[in-house]
Amino acid sequence: MNSVSDRFALFIDGPNLSATARALGFDIDFRRLLREFHGYGRLLRATYYTPVIEGQENPLITWLDQNGYTVVTKATKEFVDASGRRKIKKSVNVELAVDAMDLAGYMDRMVLFSGDGGLRSLVQAVQRRGVRVTLVSTVASQPPMIAAELRRQADVFVDLRELRPRISRDPS
């Protein structure tokens, strides 16, 4: 993937990664995922972004926070759209983008776990600062879990199914 002297950070769009793994038929073992990337260079930070419903316990968030991940949460917001339907706003893209731009001057590579095409501008912005972007998602599902324009923008694309044997949770 890169030189062992590269400084890099993991940016994980939690809901997107979970949906992608589910589409491929497995669950992520986050301990194994972190171990997988430790040998790829100097890991500056592994950040997991997720929306939360206030007052609701989430054991995964607690575990991640205690096991080497920085966890960034954002409270979901309910609103009524133009057609009068109730919707829940649950995107963490802004938080992820702000953190990535803050770290851009300190990292050589960004590893982004997401397929959200809304992050293409972020990828372009960090690339302009000299950061190489590795994108992790999948094209193996129907429909693909990654926006085509995001995949084309990345310097390297890694299909999550290739990582499955090394990062999937044991079914026990």
Sequence positions of predicted segments:
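Short, structured coil segments at secondary-structure junctions
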Residues: 67, 129, 150-153
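Short glycine-/acidic-enriched loop or helix-start segments at secondary-structure transitions
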Residues: 21-22, 58, 122-123, 145, ...
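Structural recognition of alpha->loop->beta junctions
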Residues: 97-101, 144-169
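Short, well-ordered beta-strand core segments
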Residues: 70, 110, 157-158
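Short loop/turn motifs at secondary-structure junctions
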Residues: 42-44, 106, 153
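Active-site histidine-anchored catalytic micro-motif
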Residues: 105-148
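Domain-level signal for Mg2+-assisted phosphodiester chemistry and nucleotide/NA-binding surfaces
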Residues: 1-92, 102, 132, 138-142
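Short, charged, intrinsically disordered terminal tails
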Residues: 1-3, 165-172
